């Protein structure tokens, strides 16, 4: 803490001090609220809505509204908001992030700003990380809102569209971040306005905001359909990847190195950058790939797919580790969440990486999916008019919240003083010595009946420690992605005396570890971290499992100089110093320099990861601007706007661009290439082909006018073919929707391909993001032209039908995130089954197989 903070307090302390008058004003209404009957308390909601309509603001109503909720919670749940919870509620209402330690009652805090903002009638979304929490909080906290006359809904993974629509129509809706994002994407794929489920995005409160907006920010939400691509190339590239030799680079190719003309000397066929998780082929490797596939130049556009797939295969073999990043179960690759350690059923890596891992592990390679719609959480949550968030750990990422989301973090004081002792890290030379020390620490705590929670980063480490503890005869539970069905049971027992629990990061959130009296006497829950995580935030979460609500406890991390964190990001000079000290085996190293090195290594990684996410946002911002234009266009069509003028503009634009492309102003009409013009325009607009006689003596602008006149007359003739004008208006909407969706889906794939290949621009001393923006702009314009041409072509060549129905361009086959991994119920038949020899239900007197059964078979 610097001198300024010591004298004036931290920024959070100053912010809390600033809002204390509001807190005191809220508390001053307590006696007034207590005197009201239930009916009078409920009537307050109507009163506040009326006052809002008369010009008062939410800030004017805040103290009284918060006091109303406080009294309602006391009557309905028997829980009264502490002063620190009122502070948290004000921070959330202001669109900021409240950092509240684990066990401080964040769930109850959300009721205050949710009620206040719901008074506007525009809807409030309370966002949780899984279905279980959404359902639990809606049933539990929802009682308070319902008591006060507001409606409460919950959106769960297995709900039908009409149930979702009803839930989003409520004043307050509890929903997971994944369902919220997917519903937004699905709403922008519907073909009738009545199929929309969401309202406008007004205000949201995000629980565990760091998990949603930072940990998951690098994984976009993707809705996919089946692709027609073969899976053979993945298997072929996997064979080649195993034949290529891993090499080293003399140093990293930075922009400055490229400008200075420094040469990077690379050995082997490919080099791996573990820090940035990137694989690159060397010159030697490129030649080997070209020879293997019998191609001349791997960099040619037609070889982009081979280039992409060989890099995927090398990533699968060198950066994706079994039992750490994924597990193989029932001939299937299941992803392990790196932050929680949980298996994520139904979720697949995008862009072909999942298929590359399937080929590596020799399980059935599933067909690659085609992206139909996609958005990142960064761009999705920035669509809200206002958003607030809660978490136990956010201060370390405050810069990111501020830069990307425009939100600041305020640390809320705890209700009771934290009693947990956080001890200095214990550092050892090797992993073997470190694990021996961990086992000794567990034995020592176990001897005095103190419960121990050992946190590991990988499944492999948890299983190694389990074997070591077994040899020592210490009974323990293991909690990792492989055994997560038992999670609730194991966590419930983790605070009991003598309990020893080994857990990957999954034991983190939404679960309470309660101590018994013997455990409390023995010093509370002892936390042992076996490795520092890349993020200080995840380490703080592990520590936060102990010492809830003033309970005793202690925490310590055990580290070795061989850990990935120290190996990749620790200072080499420092490592050499400690290596040369000649430390004896099993001796613990303690030095301020070492603690600083660990802290610096984590800061370096956090900065690195922030850079990756910021870079992703730079690219995705381009996609986002294009997505906004396309979705806005779609929404106009859905809203039933008359598209006649838009279609006429498309026709005239096509005539203008075709004429400009084929005819030059400074050439005589006799020199114009009429064949080129006729070949280009007549498949789209069926005009009479231009002849030399027709254009003789005319200027280009006059030709444009002649062609436009004929095109408009042709369209008017098409209009006259329809009995009702509205039939053609609906047809225009149907065709336009179909063309927009079809072209947009192809464009998403093209943009992804562009992003994959754009990194090479850095070698040419050009900024990849600038190049990406320029290429993306050109591609987007081409797509718009293509939409216009296809729409006009289809409308000119359509045959009149009495019934016009809209249909989706592509069938959705899945998403890349699944909140509910629970078993699905089998589909039940609504009517009795009709067998081939039964009498036909239509009443014809024939057997079913000779009547309607035959028709059904043909379909």
Locate predicted features:
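Hydrophobic, well-ordered secondary-structure elements that form the walls
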Residues: 454, 502, 744, 780, ...
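Short Cys/His-rich zinc-binding micro-motifs
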Residues: 830-849, 853
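Active-site-adjacent structural elements in folded domains
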Residues: 110, 438, 825-827, 835
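Extended, charged helical/alpha-beta scaffold domains that provide interaction surfaces
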Residues: 326-334, 340-347, 549-550, 557, ...
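Positions in alpha-helical segments
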Residues: 27-31, 617, 778, 838
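Short, Lys/Glu-rich amphipathic helical modules
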Residues: 448-462, 639-640, 692-696, 841
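Conserved P-loop NTPase motor core
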Residues: 1-582, 631-632, 648, 653
